[in-house]
Amino acid sequence: AYEMLRSLVGSEMCIREELEEADEDLSVSLFGTLIDSLTAAGYEHYEISNFCLPGFHSRHNSSYWTEKKYLGCGPSAHSYNGTSRQWNVASLNEYIRGISNGNPTFEVEELDLYTRYNDFVITHIRTQWGMPLPKLRKQYGEELYKYCLRMATPHLQQGTLEIKNDTLKLTRKGVFISDGIMSDMLWVE
């Protein structure tokens, strides 16, 4: 499910062959055991890599998964207003200088319809709530709605996706290959 970043201590140990990276089958088995153990203990598996006791979902991450607008303050902080993403300069000194001069340094990415659709797919399909198909159709139009269903069809047939109550969701089997499923469903020109 995850790859080690070169900057992590464990990855350096793998490079020096002091620590072996678990093979994929073992990783899948361990993640399955984690899901089973935590859900048996009363935790909700509400997002691919998030578990919580009922009612204790991450408020911060839930903003991403529910398309809520958010404001990020400070160096490297990100904001989202529904049509664009914005992020502040990473350097603390540069950030303070910009604020002091009344001219904060940040970058903006305007999000076109297809980018917003891709964000919708990535953020919704990862959660236990899935992707509400009527909302997809209303927000992104008939073309992207049909595209999404066409791209989802092989996964529906393989049992890695399901549609329940007009909502497209990963099955347990799909959770283990979610990156591939999401990438199949993204709009690529």
Question: Which residues fall in each region the model found?
Answer:
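Single conserved hydrophobic/aromatic residue that forms the stacking wall/gate
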Residues: 1-15
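C-terminal scaffold of the Radical SAM
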Residues: 11-142
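Short amphipathic alpha-helical interaction segments
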Residues: 142-156
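A short, conserved structural fragment
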Residues: 156-166
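Minor-groove-contacting beta-hairpin "wing" of winged helix-turn-helix DNA-binding domains
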Residues: 167-171
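Short, amphipathic alpha-helical interaction segments positioned at domain boundaries
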Residues: 173-189
